[in-house]
């Protein structure tokens, strides 16, 4: 029993130390500057997040590409106004990308 319990406790502790993984995508979206230019349903400075999800539905590698755009910024994807780099970690960018792509 001890041989199983100790690794399980260690794994639980390691996961607890990664707050970005525990955060919900929507809460992360609201805590970062994303909402200054984007909303879920309505185009603002940037596209509505549901538009982004629809455009990328079924596209292989979309989550990775979107995560890179979120972290590093992009230009010319949705119009002439560039998206600046965002103060997010790679993990947070991935969480945000997966959340955006899950929107219907």
From Swiss-Prot:
GO cellular component: periplasmic space
Result, substituting residue 100 to I: In strain: 221
The keyword Signal is annotated on this UniProt entry: yes
Cystine residue pairs: none
Binding of heme c, residues: 34, 37-38, 83
Post-translational modification: Binds 1 heme c group covalently per subunit.
UniProt subcellular location: Periplasm
Principal subcellular localization: periplasm
Documented effect of changing residue 40 to I: In strain: 221
Record note on what altering residue 56 to Y does: In strain: 221
Matching PROSITE patterns: CYTC
Effect of residue 49 to F: In strain: 221
Transmembrane spans: none
Leader sequence segment: 1-22
Keywords (A to Z) from UniProt: Electron transport, Heme, Iron, Metal-binding, Periplasm, Signal, Transport
GO molecular function, one term: heme binding
InterPro entries membership: Cyt_c-like_dom, Cyt_c-like_dom_sf, Cyt_c_ID
Superkingdom as given in the UniProt entry: Bacteria
Effect of residue 68 to G: In strain: 221
Entry function: Electron donor for cytochrome cd1 in nitrite and nitrate respiration.
The protein, known as: Cytochrome c-551
Gene assigned in the entry: nirM
């Amino acid at each position: 029993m001890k041989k199983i319990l100790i690794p399980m406790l260690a794994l639980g502790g390691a996961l607890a130390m990664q707050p970005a993984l525990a955060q919900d995508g929507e809460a992360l979206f609201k805590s970062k500057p994303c909402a200054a230019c984007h909303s879920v349903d309505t185009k603002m400075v940037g596209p509505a997040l549901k538009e982004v999800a629809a455009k990328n539905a079924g596209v292989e590698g979309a989550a990775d590409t979107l995560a890179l755009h979120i972290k590093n910024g992009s230009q010319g994807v949705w119009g002439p106004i560039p998206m600046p780099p965002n103060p997010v970690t790679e993990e947070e960018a991935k969480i945000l990308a997966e959340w955006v792509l899950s929107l219907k």
